[in-house]
């Protein structure tokens, strides 16, 4: 056994061959003996394999073992225990084994038989012959004696059967430990044993009689051992799982065998064999056949399956078979989900309770699949209904849909067609709101289209704030993207930006910012790019050269920007990147802020100097206002300014067109020479001049970029890391947002 066990089990042994291992054992015999003395709980197989792996260096092996770096093979550990029990069993072998043996032996013997088949393929098949099996009888006893020892006397009748699989020959051995473990089982088996002796190999027939004879207590015990034997048989690959299928009663593996330890303990589905006797035996046979193909090599076990099924009829009430759990899984996954067996109740006491679901499981399994499908359909139906309701709720709660619907009336009426369906419900409850909201939010989104920009200045922030409050109320559930302008392209809707887009950013409330911007704009329209009512006007004012710094000073009055600037309108006009534009500091320009706001618009970053009440935008802005509807409202410079141009301001570095010349740095701060033309303009106007100077050369938006390149000087103001010249933030966000970007 040991050598075969080595070859079969110790996969770790590099010398899987018995011969090689034996030779190694010979060379390391002294080390082996010393190790065996030092570690009596280890088997020679393990120790010899360790020695072989470590070149028979005793110290290394001892170190590994002592430090738990090496562990015994579990099956061998348990077998070592089994050997101890075998010794006990050998002592009991002389006990009247014949009394107990055959009837129960069929169950456990089949399980044990299969179990050892797993361990020892070589011996397992010949085990059908009585001679080999009887010789192996003590080994067969090993796994079961553990279980039986735990099962104690009640289990003994079944355990005694474990050894008897081969036939009456094994019976004495099985009776030995069985007799030791349980004499009650022996008594019952004495009756059955007479029958079983008559039919030791046809064990099928004797079992049904003795098991019905078996007492109820023993029936539970039988169930227990069957579970144990079944556990082993289940785990032994060659062992016929059929007995497992039928006998996989609530497995109570009792540490006895590695198989029991390894086997997941399927207590989930104890089935009474009454149900099994009819439908389950059929299913088991079909499934058993399924597994027979796998485990056919064991013949005696197949016989025993029939035996187990017969006792199932006899013991039907109490032998719970968890087989369905093992069997049902291979057959179909759905019935498992639908199976009535609750995995929570696993105790044997629940067997009877669960026998009904067990019966129903097979009976119901087919309808269960149907029911489960129906349930799924119902669930999906509910889910769909819920989704519809939720979607409707979302849309109901989305002012944006309504805004979008109106904005989309402009942008896409197709979407309206879709949304009215969704929003019709939303509109009906909210129609009282819609007349308000569409008026208010619609307009901010209508201005999304540059054509409606003139309306934008007309809309007060109050409406925006109201709509925004409504939005906030209804943003509790909102479709994330509905918030944003539906214009897929920033050029289109960018002009409504501040309210429609940034105001809506989920994490940020820009309402205060817009208000501040509006206030700041009045004081210094250029100070906040909001002051530049439209990108187009903003950039165009910049693009058009200020006739003089004086004009720039007057620009506030002259520029349509300032005229347009109502704190109400400013909210919409606050230059901001179209939706989704990152808020980064672009290396050249932040496209939609400061410089970027009109990108050619005002010298450096939205020149702060302009903040002093002179919007840098010139009266010239209005002639370009037609362009406002153009790209980003900066119709002139168009995309070129939309993206920061490396040379746009004559220098890659945004704040100072060229490295600030000392004169410019002074003048930039004192007052940037607008393109050095209005160099004397006070700093407040100076930056405005810078931007305007940029706009001077940008008089033609096309020319702006080269002109800017011509004006390396624009904002002498070195707008270094501080970027404090971003008026567009109205002081709202100082330097902090740019801190990380160097």
Swiss-Prot record:
Ubiquitinated. Proteolytically cleaved by the proteasome in response to transcription stress; the resulting N-terminal form constitutes the activated nuclear form and the C-terminal portion is degraded. Residues 1-30, 79-494, 642-742 are annotated as: Disordered. Residues 681-700 have a biased composition (Polar residues). Residues 1-14 have a biased composition (Basic residues). Its main location: cytoplasm. Keywords: Chromosome, Cytoplasm, DNA damage, DNA repair, DNA-binding, Nucleus, Telomere, Ubl conjugation, Ubl conjugation pathway. Residues 79-90, 110-125 have a biased composition (Basic and acidic residues). Signal peptide: none annotated. The keyword DNA repair applies. Recruits the ubiquitination machinery to RNA polymerase II for polyubiquitination, removal and degradation, when the transcription-coupled repair (TCR) factor RAD26 fails to efficiently displace stalled RNA polymerase II. Also involved in telomere length regulation. Binds DNA. Homodimer; may form higher order oligomers. Interacts with the large RNA polymerase II subunit RPO21; the interaction is direct and serves to bridge RPO21 to the Elongin complex in a manner dependent on transcription stress. Interacts with RAD26. This is RNA polymerase II degradation factor 1. It comes from Debaryomyces hansenii (strain ATCC 36239 / CBS 767 / BCRC 21394 / JCM 1990 / NBRC 0083 / IGC 2968) (Yeast). The lineage of its organism: Eukaryota, Fungi, Dikarya, Ascomycota, Saccharomycotina.
